[in-house]
């Protein structure tokens, strides 16, 4: 399990680095996005990964790895939005956004470590394509919860689904040798 923790941190470090660079380029323009918009961005990334896995021909020179990074970063943005709400104008500088990024990546890693202990690292035996399908399934669940105005009867809330998608994407990146 110690390797998993280190591998997880390496993936998050790569994603975090890109997040910080994009914050420098664009600021926190993403803070205006409502949750369904972030969900749709993650859906686009996951759908592209599935197409890449199924099709031999690629017309855009970007592979699965960059899309999984996008899923991780958009999931953290969604968790930040859930906690802080949507704003009319960007309101976070790079330092503030990075603090929130680190907070949510830490919470999500703790969840992964707890589940990983209980499931005995079963994800290591899974295919990347199965992890992609699980992300797509979680997205459909989130869309349904969003359509239900955030209400669930017996199911986990939206935050748990974003965390699971993020963890599945990290596992996929580890499988891909990130």
PLM regions and their residue ranges:
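Intrinsically disordered, low-complexity regulatory regions
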Residues: 1-178
